[in-house]
Each structure stands twice: as structure tokens, then as C-alpha cells.
Amino acid sequence: MVLCLFIGFLMAAGMMSAVPIYMDASLQRMLIKDMESYQLSTGDFPGIYSVSKTIGSGTGTAEQRALIDELPAQVRERVGAVRIPIGSSKTIVWDNLQYLINGTNKGVVASTRVKLAAMTDFSDHIVLKSGRMFCAGGVAEDGVYEVVASDTALKSLEAVLNGEYEVRSVDTGREPIRVRIVGVYEQSDPNDIYWSETADRYVNALITDYNCFTERLLGGGYAQLTDILVNYALSYQSMDMNDLPSVTAALSDDFTYYNELGYTFKMGIFKILEEYAVEAEKLTGILWTLQIPTMVMIAFYLFMVSRLNVEQEKNEIAIFKSRGSSSKQIFFLYAPESGIL
């Protein structure tokens, strides 16, 4: 009887614990499938958490550099409250108000719109197809700024590897600089979520050292910060589905927070997560409803086995009492067995 009672308790515990496990696994599979469909249809990595700011031309250098320090720190704090593991992150800064001077044509200066850009941890996520990486600090001994570019950028800019060019700002009050394209890069891994945004952003970009951009180019007044972007690639595949309500609440707060500060916040899958929070509640209710008949049957089973066990033990309890055992002694005699069950 004790063995039967133990089996009943074991079945009840198994049924109760199976519901959240099954629900979590089901929602996880559904979410990953929908995320993959989202990526195929939009071309964007589903877990991208993106905050950007476009800076007006009248913004002073000190304010630009302060923003470079403040925005990544603000985003780091906010994204930490979202209970999704972080896969990768980077900060991108650029000046898209520059022109690359390609030469002259019949006495007319030939120029192409170019974007001077820099990003954190860039060298860890690329391989060089040709040439070399820009020098430490980004400025050669002869004072020329060293940059690297993609094949697409070279074609777009009509530039060549090891070519040296003059770059002029749209703002005529800024001094021109000279840049040397010392390397041609490509992504080290096509599936690296560091490159989660579309490649269109780098079609006409020359990449330089991050500190060189923020300290030398901005500090020296040769460039201006026109845009800053902080990207976090969140590993949605590892998200605990039990955290879904808190995740959607945190993201909803982030939309309000960034909007009040004048930043642009993008989380393409926010609507999907909101829908899944509702679906999770519905699925939980359905699963528990389906479990009720089984749980009632197990409850009756435990009740009947317990009654039979009590009837069986009555004679033994009577014998113990006849031998002078107190109720307290009898209770402690059966307590270990009940505790184990």
C-alpha cells in the first residue's frame, strides 16, 4: 500500500511539473520559428536592440563627444534590464557630410559622397582580403589618416587600394584631410551577429580607428558627428519564456524612455514578443484545463489508497496502544514514512 501511495504521489508531481516544462518548450519552438521567418522576410536579425541619434549641424564638438560617452552607457544600463542574453554589441559613429576628391575632369573637381565611420571591436570581426589594417591610432607618421574599405565601397567611391585622397567636409569652414586606403576587408563570418544590421550602411564608408575618429577627427574639428548608433544583438534563442512578461514590459518602458530623450529606438520583434506574452497566458490556461480530469483521477486514487492504508494500519495502532504507547509516540512512529511520501 505504501508503494502504491508513493507511485500516486510521484505521478501527481510529474503531472504538475510537466505543464510549465511543456509550455516553455512549445513556446520556445514557436518563437524561434517566427523569428527565423521575420529574418527571412526583412533581412534583419530578429534580436537587434538598436538606439540611434542624428545630430544637427549646429551641435558643438564638446556636446558631440559627450553624446559618444553618454549614449552607450545609457543603452548598456537599459538593455541589462531586458532579460534576454546579450550576444554581441557595438557602437558606430560616422560623419556622412564628407566628399572624397577623385581628381579633376577637364578642370572640374571630381568628387564622391563618402562616409567617414568607426566602430568598436571592428578588428575582431573582419578579415583583410588585401592590404593591412590601419595603424594604431589611425594616423600615419606623415599625418595621413589610414582607413580600410570593403570591395563595394571601393567601387562606389571609384577608389583603389593604397590610394591617397583628399576628403573635404560639406562645411567649408572645416579643413580638408588626406586619407590613405591601406586595406580591403570583409566579414570574418557571414553569420556573425556583430554584423546584424544591413550592409547598406557601409556602401560608401571608409572605416578608421574608433579612438582616432572620436579624439583626432572630432577633437580637431576635421569631422562632425552626424550619427551615432548603439546596437545590441540579443540571443533570443536562449531566452527563458517565463521571463516573457517582464521582457515585454521592459521593452515598452524603453520605447518611452528613448523617445523622451529624442533617440530612435528599434526592436523589430517587439510586437511578436507582445503577442507571445498573450499566447503564453492562453496556452497555460488550456494546458491546465486539459490536466484537470487527470489530476482529479489521481486525487481519487490517492484518497482511496490512503483510506485502505489507514484501515490496514488500524490493528497495528491498536496493538501499540494496548502496550501503553501514547498518541505522540505513535505519531512519531509513522511520521518518517509520511514525510518521505
Report the location of each language-model feature.
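Membrane transport/envelope proteins' first extracytoplasmic loop
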Residues: 1-298
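Interfacial "coupling" helices/loops that link adjacent transmembrane helices in transporter permeases
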Residues: 26, 300-340
